[in-house]
Amino acid sequence: MSKAAITPLLKFEIVEIIKANVFPTYANTYLCIGRPTRWGDDADPELATEIEDVVYSTNYINQTFRDMIAMKRVAAADTALVVPRVDWVTGTRYDEYRDGLELFSHTDKLTLGGTVNASANLITTNTAVFTGSISVGNTITLNAESRQVVGVNATHIVVNTNFTYAVLDGTVVRTDNTYPHFANTFYVRNSKDQVFKCLHNGADNGVGLQSTIEPTIDIDGQLPENPWISTSDGYKWKYLYTIPYGLKQKFFTRTWMPVVDDNAVVAGSTSGRIDIVEIHDGGTGYFLDNGESGNVSSLSIITIEGDGVGAVATARIASGVITEVNILNGGSGYTYAEVVVNDPDQLPTGNLANLVASISPPGGHGFNPRKELGCYSVMTSVDFVGTETDTIPVGTDVVPFDFRQIVLLRDPMLANGIFANGSVYRTTTKLSLTDPGTSNYTNDETVYIGTSEEDSTFTATVVNWDPNTNELFVNNIRGEPTIGSTLTGGVSAATSTVLGVEDPTVALFTGDLLYIENRDKIVRDADQTEQIRLVLSF
């Protein structure tokens, strides 16, 4: 028997590798748009609104290639590492960094007060209160067994599966999945786009206080002299970085925000530094030599012992109790530390204080914000501007154009056998036709060559029809179009003679499909820019 865990650092290494090797400069990766037709059965509007599930099979991959419309190369500036966005909000209790806290868990547990009894799939209250704490759909744990709540009121909970054993005087724990955010809210972004990590949340009671003062610094070329800032609500915050304006425009959403280094913060960080000493018990009976309370030198009563060097602190005493510990020098190189209090003038009846040092992560606070904030995601943000020089179709008020599928494709080949490295490519086939007269082909319809769609030598889906040039762009091709043949619209009944065939420059069915996302339809017009964002999380 063994127990193992993949650490968050492996996820971080994965996103770093993905960013470096999937996107420039080591590969040519393209963001593709496709699927002009509706989801589901076109004959049933209700089914057509249900987004299709992605299935990784050979048939589905081939169909994804057939449905492609256009692709645009992902530039180096189109990718960034991101973390879940957390805005500072007054009245919120934020979690503080502690060297013994599992910061990056997505599991939030809330223990209900009081006890309960359980039999089969029914939990009845003993002294617990259910209303306001439990809802249908929540996951709860009782006697080490997890169940989903299917019914609840003030006096009982009904779960989906019977418990193995009856429970008397048990404790109910509600378990919430906070993904993509972490269960511990230990960092914030302020109104100036400055990002801070919480080092102390205002009290040493293990719970903390509500934050009422927004952390902020004025940057004029220098950072604050202290490694952290203190606000009047008792919080201590470590400044990490400011989100650059350009990155905010491209990678900032309601859920995600970019994470970067601040060179000055990195240069000022110290590995194994002690920035915070918490008072778990202030003790009693501590006095100065003259019997008055006040500041006491750490050399006389406080020593920080461990495998690092240089940590020096002072203590403030009020009525014989240690009420505050001030760090004069956080030292460096600590992986463990013990705060020893030795006051020769302590009253014989006094109790020893319990002070606990919090050691910074490897490199120090601010040395690597991506690791410190648990970065496990990379965002791609690509702009499709208008027609991209007559490469990507757009619609009109009369003939709308839309797409429903987004794909990341690495290292596609061109028809001439070399790797694609251009900026934008059309992946549809262009048919030059004779004028269909008063009829017009309609987007999304099937066109065919033959006596009927069922008895045809060629079928394709209309992506876009340009009546001004009599050019028809199609994908999802079956068979080969022949010049001189009659092309018929399956819905419009429009007919034309094929005058020319221009295949796409890109060779379909080449390259690696790394990501497929099916969405609701996105409608394009000539004056529109789509900023398509994809987030890959691990």
What are these regions (language model features)?
Residues R85-D87, T92-D108, L122-S133, N143, ...:
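A structural micro-motif recognizing beta-strand termini
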Residues M1-D108, T171-S271, N354-S358, G417-A420, ...:
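Tryptophan-rich substrate-binding surfaces of secreted polymer-degrading and adhesive proteins
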Residues V150-N153, G202, G331, D466:
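A generic structural motif
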Residues N226, S230-F538:
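Conserved, function-critical positions that sit in or immediately flank catalytic
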Residues Y26-N28, N117-S119, G137, S146, ...:
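Glycine-centered loop/turn motifs
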Residues A154, T161-T171, Y334-T335, N351-L352:
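Extracellular interaction modules
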Residues V116, I123, F130, G137-I140, ...:
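Extracellular/surface recognition and adhesion modules
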Residues I134, N143, P180-A183, V309, ...:
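Residues that act as N-cap/strand-start positions at coil-to-secondary-structure junctions
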